[in-house]
Design a protein with these regions (language model features):
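C-terminal motif of bacterial Sec signal peptides marking the signal peptidase cleavage site
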Residues: 16-19
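Short, linear, compositionally biased motifs with a strong N-terminal bias
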Residues: 11-14
Length: 252
């Protein structure tokens, strides 16, 4: 039975590992396209520090081998990030997550099948577990991800180190994905208005769980360059009440 993912503030401490419309039938673009909205697949693998953990050990002794294996198996993974808690919840069993980004669920399933059937990948997992031990496919939290705008539209992100926070939401009675798209339409209009005072990189995405859970219907993720800029952005949101007002109309 899959445990619940902890919703909290996460920071991309380890850096980059690898180099919606209101219509009833919206079209989506793949990651890397200049067209939006984009729809893709995101996975969060729970990880725990080993006895030999350090950022240096990860970057020098663990990461290069993983990157080489990705080339060997011709992986379709688009990107990967290491996420750690800014303030770890007391009941969190993991120290952080290894985030994988794919263009589709089919690519993810193919990638996992190839990886788990590759002996050298198994050897790498075992040999690096004292640095960082991560779960397998069964432990992974998978989501359909939706992004309306370029993350660099409010300023260019440094993808090697940023701050993110995730809010779990449940639909109010009679509400669903179409109403959520309408909320996003209104939020987009607000972001482009003079009421938006965000002057630093900011992006957001919406995640729909691709696994059984009664805890929430979707997750709203906000991304800022630093924890300090996140505080300023949140103050802007609170002052205008924009996200809480819009989302609370369909979810809680």
């Amino acid at each position: 039975m899959k445990k619940n993912i902890k919703i909290a503030t996460l920071v991309a401490l380890l850096g980059v590992f690898v180099a919606c419309s209101s219509e009833s039938t919206p079209t989506y673009s793949e990651l890397g396209s200049e067209n939006y909205p984009q729809k893709f697949y995101v996975e969060y693998i729970p990880c725990n520090y080993g006895a030999d953990w350090s950022p240096e050990a990860f970057n020098e002794d663990m990461l290069p081998g993983w990157q080489e294996l990705l080339v060997e198996v011709d992986s379709k993974v688009v990107g990967a990030y290491g996420l750690v808690y800014e303030n770890k919840p007391e009941d969190a069993q993991e120290d952080g997550f290894w985030q994988l980004v794919w263009n589709s669920k089919a690519d993810a399933e193919e990638g996992w099948s190839t990886w788990e059937g590759y002996d050298k990948a198994t050897e790498w997992n075992e040999s690096t577990a004292t640095i960082l031990a991560c779960g397998d496919k069964e432990d992974t939290f998978s989501f359909d991800a939706y992004v309306r705008r370029d993350f660099n539209s409010q300023g260019e992100f440094d993808a090697e180190n940023f701050a993110s926070d995730y809010q779990a939401c449940s639909y109010n009675e009679g509400q669903g994905s179409q109403e959520l798209i309408s909320v996003i339409d209104d939020f987009e209009a607000w972001l482009d208005s003079e009421n938006n005072l965000i002057s630093q990189p900011y992006g957001y995405m919406v995640l729909a769980p691709d696994y059984e859970t009664d805890e929430f219907d979707f997750i709203w993720g906000n991304f800022n360059q630093t924890a300090e800029s996140r505080v300023l952005a949140n103050e802007n949101f609170l002052e205008n009440g924009i996200i809480r007002f819009l989302v609370s109309s369909i979810a809680e």
